[in-house]
Amino acid sequence: MKVGKDLINEIDGSVPATGEVLAWWLGQHSFIIKIKDRIIYIDPYLSDKDKRLISPFIKPEELTNAHIILGTHDHSDHIDRPAWPAIAKASPSAKFAIPEAVKKNVIEATGVSADRVIGMNDPETKEICSVKISAVASAHEFLAPDPKTGFYPCLGYVIEYGGVTVYHSGDCCIYDGLASKLKKWKIDLAFLPINGRDALRYTTGCIGNMTFQEAADLAGPLNFGLTIPSHYDMFAGNRENPKSFTDYMAAKYPTCKTMIPRYTTVFSVKAR
């Protein structure tokens, strides 16, 4: 397991084959993907806070190789406001894509230059650093679009580049229409939360996500190339056993591939 600059050097030195995506897990819902010559950080959670069960594997100032930073929604373990100024400085050419609904507040809070922050909303598709990125609304308990603007505060992203298609749901529950939206893509790699939700967490302000069964019942019928469960390891009281997901997938959708990732350990997926 590599950390810090050693991890950055490994990412820089890794060369994906044609039609291949390389990926690294940083814990929680944070992933790094590399496709061809593009390095994308999704929800990098790098602030070292006391409540974390897993310490950050990279310091914000070590993140020197980003082309794109994707933030799915404005919670601290997804859009890590304290870390963003250092990330922006360390990767001076990186672009930051986030929900349009939170763009103004995030810019004001982080000081990241407005010309580097790209607002997204379902069903927009934008080309960022030559990478095609589509926004898909996520229901973090609720869809909750702004009644005036129609902007969704929580998004997932479909990333298309180099013949590979990757979906990161962000924090999301199943809602009517989600599967239909995703059917338009042949997704090679998907990252889904499995920590679920309940009354106790909701009443204490911890809004939830798919259960492991719901994540399976999204991934299975859509036949994702490889589905990675996540968002189950970082905070006490908001956890799940990832083997529950992989076992359920194996029983119910035996032809679908899943994997429990290891921290900062590269894995690869080929386009189908």
Regions found by a protein language model. Give the residues of each.
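Metallo-beta-lactamase
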Residues: 2-18, 98-164, 248-271
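Active-site-proximal beta-strand elements of phosphoester/diester hydrolases
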Residues: 22-25, 39-43, 132-138, 165-171, ...
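Cap/insert and terminal regions of metallo-dependent hydrolase folds
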Residues: 95-97, 101-104, 173-265
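Active-site metal-binding loops of divalent metal-dependent hydrolases
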Residues: 44-46, 73-74, 138-140, 170-172, ...
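Divalent metal-coordination and catalytic microenvironments
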Residues: 33, 43, 73, 80, ...
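Structural motif
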Residues: 38-40, 67-68, 95, 131, ...
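Metal-dependent catalytic neighborhoods of phosphoester/phosphodiester hydrolases
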Residues: 80-90, 105-109, 237-247
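Pre-active-site segment of Zn-dependent metallo-hydrolases
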Residues: 9-13, 32-74, 78-89, 143-144, ...
